[in-house]
């Protein structure tokens, strides 16, 4: 098919779906950069504490996001098959699952907060540990609100509404920055102030998204939340997609924790440098990640409509878009690296290491990132989640984690070892996913009636 009018999604539809997602991700990362710069003025120990705790927080956030994405894929396929009733039933179960799971995780983290931090980051300096405990206390309370927002935002995107999550996120991020300014600088609360501001902004997101989904003019309308009861068949379908993706994301974060534990032995300067580099690397990937998130909605609806050739077409099309986004983003972020380290008040040694790592990323990321991620987004939307989980976990542990630990502990490399391992992981994973995509075996799954 070469005529764009023959496709389920026109170029205009794609732009309307992707641009808000890309802008939302970009602004969130920019706000994260500003957030870190604000915290960095408190001191290197504060930056290190936020970085260490966020490696745990992101583990939880990624797991919750994967479950929500599983529900969104289910909703997308129901919408593609012209079954809005099924989409609405699935959406209600997504909210139920996310609420129960996020509250449970928050409670566990609250009870095990101190021993967990000491077990993972026991070798850090006392000041960093104290700041970490204060920061984690407030951020763990936000997990249920993250779960509710993720559920709502994913459901909105499943019905082609990516503008609403973007708007909510924009307002939330500015509230977070404003809260930081008041609590960190005005009241001198340090990392605790940053955490409280984050908690408040996430509560805002959850409340607004719940209200927004009550609109009966939408394809999916979720109201009377108190009447939601378990539908075990739908819950199993949500978890069929969500659990493998959650394990994949969680294993990825466990790997980052293992790496972070190794980096934490290199000293506060290395921890701070790697923390800022992580933010910059995330920033140069947000546009392409937005393409991947939108691709799940597109492929999900194609599969639901029984148009598998369309799914293949869109994965190829959006992979090219993601590659262009990666190249441009890497160049822009590299140009901003030195100004950010200066404005953030980083120590000279940390700034030097940060610049070197960002240069390495700018060279290597455009080579391998797209093939290792974008086709996988589409294949997961078709239900091919177990293969993605196995491939990603094996590659991450065998390449990323092993290389980093080997280079740091045996050969005496600094934090640059993290990114050498990352490049190896991306390369291997990209090769495997490319073979899987061209085999078309990922099209043989059925997750809706």
Per-region residue spans from a language model:
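Helix-terminus/linker motif at the lipid-water interface of multi-pass membrane proteins
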Residues: 26, 30-48, 117-126, 182-189, ...
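Transmembrane helical elements of multi-pass membrane transporters/channels
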Residues: 16-35, 138, 172, 201-205, ...
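Small-residue hotspots at the loop-to-helix junctions and early N-terminal turns
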Residues: 44-55, 132, 136, 195, ...
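N-terminal transmembrane alpha-helices
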Residues: 5-37, 41-42, 58-70, 74, ...
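Residue-level hotspots within the lipid-embedded alpha helices of multi-pass solute transporters
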Residues: 25-29, 62, 102, 106, ...
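Small-residue-rich hydrophobic transmembrane alpha-helices
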Residues: 47-107, 146-165, 271-337, 369-393
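Short alpha-helical transmembrane segments in multi-pass integral membrane proteins
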Residues: 1-21, 75-142, 186-243, 299-365, ...
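Short runs within selected transmembrane alpha-helices of multi-pass transporters and secretion channels
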Residues: 68, 138-157, 165-173, 194-209, ...
